[in-house]
Amino acid sequence: MDSQRNLLVIALLFVSFMIWQAWEQDKNPQPQTQQTTQTTTTAAGSAADQGVPASGQGKMITVKTDVLDLTINTRGGDVEQALLPAYPKELGSNEPFQLLETTPQFIYQAQSGLTGRDGPDNPANGPRPLYNVEKDAFVLADGQNELQVPMTYTDAAGNTFTKTFVFKRGDYAVNVNYSVQNTGEKPLEVSTFGQLKQSVNLPPHRDTGSSNFALHTFRGAAYSTPDEKYEKYKFDTIADNENLNVSSKGGWVAMLQQYFATAWIPRNDGTNNFYTANLGNGIVAIGYKAQPVLVQPGQTGAMTSTLWVGPEIQDKMAAVAPHLDLTVDYGWLWFISQPLFKLLKWIHSFVGNWGFSIIIITFIVRGIMYPLTKAQYTSMAKMRMLQPKIQAMRERLGDDKQRQSQEMMALYKAEKVNPLGGCFPLIIQMPIFLALYYMLMGSIELRHAPFALWIHDLSAQDPYYILPILMGVTMFFIQKMSPTTVTDPMQQKIMTFMPVIFTVFFLWFPSGLVLYYIVSNLVTIIQQQLIYRGLEKRGLHSREKKKS
């Protein structure tokens, strides 16, 4: 197998993968977009018995820190809107990215409270609690490292429930502390809960869209337990009422999308019930309900949980909860993408530019793979040297395919040639290529990351298609420089158009990925010349002139 056949193999693998990816996306098409009415109904099944009742309208209070801009409803204390000032909605825009939203078109909320037999959020105890708050707006002042937002509610029996949001400077993790003061004569039984609910269908203003050739990151629910470090749960599965019902100590529940996530992390030593539910009106939920806690008469009980609402910053998420960093969607090649990203981030700490970091990591990867590349070209050169013997054998044996196969294998063995030696480096390169793609599409650090000149976002396609064209040119040069034994007219035509076909595919790919491929091709050209010189010295004539 020569290098041009290798290009054909890469193309077939690549096209096959893209067709499979498109088929996977089309198997479960999104239902038609519909308007969503605002609702706060809760989960069915395991959590419905003591879940979140329908609630009347409360007062909206705002909380602003250096990284979060939240709106909290005093009816229940749910976070109904979350803006991220550090992340613009679009490149060059002053409008912050909106993660949580409550509008007639779209619902995405982080709900929490106290359920259980005596909890104020238990539907059996009436409407959700209407908390009292001392002011309507809270701001983390300059020089202030922590901001507390206390909300209090006193039930008909005189018991006081306090829900306090605790914000820290530069932190997307928000602690939610509960205090239960029992003024009665009987123990109070309460359980904390945290629930994330979201409309299944994305309205136009939230659907970023992508080309049919692009890989799509996961949007849906997820959870983690000590036994299952990271499990995805599709919105479609929840909408079909195939619900989760798992009990475990520790862990978390989350909702994910490209670059951003929300998660509830219970902070207790007891058992938590993780559940999903179809809430109706096109809304699904994932949540947890903690093990009940008894607060004795005259005593005050304390409970806490943590809400993550923000970008998927891996090191910060890992510090909040075990395996929370796995929510960064690197697909099925995460075991390659994660170390690649760590290496890329380490390089970036020195060079300060993600584009140059990609160039450097390309040289590193290709340098590590150089022995395999050299073995590949050596194997192909030996295969070309054997072509006269193979052709003579075929003419001698005629149509006896079995004997041809036997004698060919004997010839390979005698000459110490591995017919698959040229394929192995390609098998290694393809997963690295795809893993880099997942890394570019899933790492928040590369969102809107500039390179140089006209490339202002390495995670987006080249707006002028210059990089894809350059990639096609480098591929054309590799093809022209590579000796070939392809004689089939159809294969020759396919190989002629291969740079054009790849250029068209890469028009919609992230600029960072195209940059990687250009640099990789340039390295290939250099390595080819070095390897060919060595092969010529060994008498392996690799620079055959192509027939015009």
UniProtKB/Swiss-Prot annotation:
State the residue spans of region: Disordered: 28-56
**Membrane-crossing residues?**
6-26, 350-370, 424-444, 458-478, 499-519
Q: Name one GO biological process term.
A: protein insertion into membrane
Enumerate the subcellular locations listed in this protein's record, separating them with semicolons.
Answer: Cell inner membrane
Keywords in alphabetical order, please: Cell inner membrane, Cell membrane, Chaperone, Membrane, Protein transport, Transmembrane, Transmembrane helix, Transport
Instruction: Give a short account of what the protein does.
Output: Required for the insertion and/or proper folding and/or complex formation of integral membrane proteins into the membrane. Involved in integration of membrane proteins that insert both dependently and independently of the Sec translocase complex, as well as at least some lipoproteins. Aids folding of multispanning membrane proteins.
Recorded protein name is Membrane protein insertase YidC
Q: Which organism is it from?
A: Salmonella paratyphi B (strain ATCC BAA-1250 / SPB7)
Lineage, top ranks: Bacteria, Pseudomonadati, Pseudomonadota, Gammaproteobacteria, Enterobacterales
> What gene does the UniProt entry assign to this protein?
yidC
